[in-house]
Amino acid sequence: MVTSPFSLSPFGQARSTVTGNPLDPTELNQMHGFWRAANYLAVGMIYLRDNPLLREPLQPEQIKHRLLGHWGSSPGISFLYTHLNRIIRKFDQDMLYMVGPGHGAPGFLGPCYLEGSYSRFFAECSEDEDGMKRFFKQFSFPGGIGSHCTPETPGSIHEGGELGYCLSHAYGAAFDNPNLIVVGLAGDGESETGPLATSWHSNKFINPIRDGAVLPVLHLNGYKINNPSVLSRISHEELKALFEGYGYTPYFVEGSDPESMHQAMAATLDHCVSEIHQIQQEARSTGIAVRPRWPMVVMRTPKGWTGPDYVDGHKVEGFWRSHQVPMGGMHENPAHLQQLEAWMRSYKPEELFDEQGTLKPGFKAIAPEGDKRLGSTPYANGGLLRRGLKMPDFRQYGIDVDQPGTIEAPNTAPLGVFLRDVMANNMTNFRLFGPDENSSNKLHAVYEVSKKFWIAEYLEEDQDGGELSPDGRVMEMLSEHTLEGWLEAYLLTGRHGFFATYESFAHVITSMVNQHAKWLDICRHLNWRADISSLNILMTSTVWRQDHNGFTHQDPGFLDVILNKSPDVVRIYLPPDVNSLLSVADHCLQSKNYINIIVCDKQAHLQYQDMTSAIRNCTKGVDIWEWASNDAGTEPDVVMAAAGDIPTKEALAATAMLRQFFPNLRIRFVSVIDLLKLQPESEHPHGLSDRDFDSLFTTDKPIIFNFHAYPWLIHRLTYRRTNHGNLHVRGYKEKGNINTPMDLAIQNQIDRFSLAIDVIDRLPQLRVAGAHIKEMLKDMQIDCTNYAYEHGIDMPEIVNWRWPL
């Protein structure tokens, strides 16, 4: 029996699938010196506030009082960074380095500083002793920078704070960047997350002709905070089979001996990059895109590599204790201070830095120059590469509306035609993303110019409506996490996209969108970060048309979560009809640095506005619909407001009934498309002034607000408004099952009858005079419910309701 050279232990001489010694003694010395310097800087960032080059014995007052950061992953991160420098120079290769365990930021920041990129963007952190001192002190320090690969990190488009998105971001960056190789370093702890586990399948969505490549590197350092990682404790054979099953060719590099590990990693990366180039050359020369087995690397090294072996008698290097700060108490424990100094001096900084504190030229020579540097690549500052979309005139895709509320049309179908032509005009920098729902969401017109990307196996029946193609630009995979990651990185590297999903399942990516919002918010304060395209999400198949799927599909709460993010980043639009949806989509696709949430159902709905009116309504965000109001020139008795397509229809129906039953009642109808208009201008840049808000909604009249989502959100937005005490909101209240649309509306009190009753109850002049009408409205509710329970559909007079001319 042949014994495998591979081991679960990360220690010892290098063991690798690819063998060889490609580094000559000079290059080996240069690379090891660069890596030693990077590790020295990583320790300095965590511990030091002064004496950066140890020109004198280390003193307690030179140590930070609060020690923050993660040492454990840093040496592996900088080890790979060092070797990617060599690959870039050898192959003149464009590269982007994505660090999944972003908490190991010292391992990325150190090499970024050494190559000169950090000082390029932050001149105060110059490449000398004073600059190094500032560089050390600012890390995880008030007024400084964070402990992850934050937006302030040159070369980063992936913070790695919330784990799981490294590979989806890596693949999204590679789409339509044929000259780029993205190296995605996935942590072994990160690999236990659902999003990361699914994103390994992204290799089935790369076209080697038009796309770049991703080289995933699994960093097996064995431990998380204080637990072993799953993948580090399964056999070599099982681990190899896992990644072969994912469709990769895995190459292993294991060990802790620096010299042999440098040789093994250099040989492995040479082989992998050559293999990638061969795959691409064959596909591009033949024009035939087939799914290859892309290479990937499994790098097993000790956690806290090159750090203290033991501290206070406890194992540290190669164990979970090295995860964050290996030892503390520097101000009270002289032994720890002495051990820290010995640790830092083990890297021999006097050999690495000159008298000014600058990395010596012999070691810096391994780094690329200019924009080839990982910290300076324009791919990590995608706004520099961004080209504006070539937009068709959205007005040409609208529908004719001669009389408001008299014709029906599916709201999203014309949007699909519009997106088709956006796609046709931008076939290298625009993609549509959706979790197996684009046809369901009536965006299928895009398939006329570009199919769904598919490079796996085909079956004969796929020709009958499958809409599959190896050069498709519609990205569908039933993983909202993976899609969101692809799109975020696609945007962060300078391109454009559009994501359509079922409203209730947008919650799957709530946390990812939160993280992206934080990224955008910080970028606003960095003048060197160029503007990127906005993240545009259409939430359709909405709560009020999920009467057939039931309670689990009824959740409009994504809006509540997204509104917690910075008002400088978040925008929410609820267009009620085709023409307003087109106007909103056109605006969002051309915007920058925002997260635009568009809520609009896909089914056939009444159409209210011609294109001119819709554009005006969208531009203003909030508007009085004159044709639905009868208070012109006078003060209204009541304001009927609506946001969302179904709530708008029901509010209009209630208005029509009230005007029929009470001809002298003065009603103002207000349409809200831009939800953030409801906030005060002091809280949101779109917010109405108090004067404008009071003019629209009055200061003392009842406001009946029919809202698409949870009603409490409107109260949250308007609580400081003058007339908030008279604001009465109807929305989704967690009442639902398998219903008809009207039954669902009645259960949640957004139906026309409930709204009309509300008006009667709120107006003193109608409380008694309107009693007969009120009881009739209750009877009509009962009739609607009984009809639905008997026939399974709504009454014809409900389904066929139109605005009375």
Swiss-Prot record:
One of its GO terms (molecular function) is aldehyde-lyase activity. Pfam families: XFP, XFP_C, XFP_N. SUPFAM superfamilies: Thiamin diphosphate-binding fold (THDP-binding). One of its GO terms (biological process) is carbohydrate metabolic process. Its cofactor is thiamine diphosphate. Its EC number is 4.1.2.-. It comes from the Bacteria. Keywords: Lyase, Thiamine pyrophosphate. Belongs to the XFP family. HAMAP family: Phosphoketolase. This is Probable phosphoketolase. It comes from Synechocystis sp. (strain ATCC 27184 / PCC 6803 / Kazusa). The lineage of its organism: Bacteria, Bacillati, Cyanobacteriota, Cyanophyceae, Synechococcales.
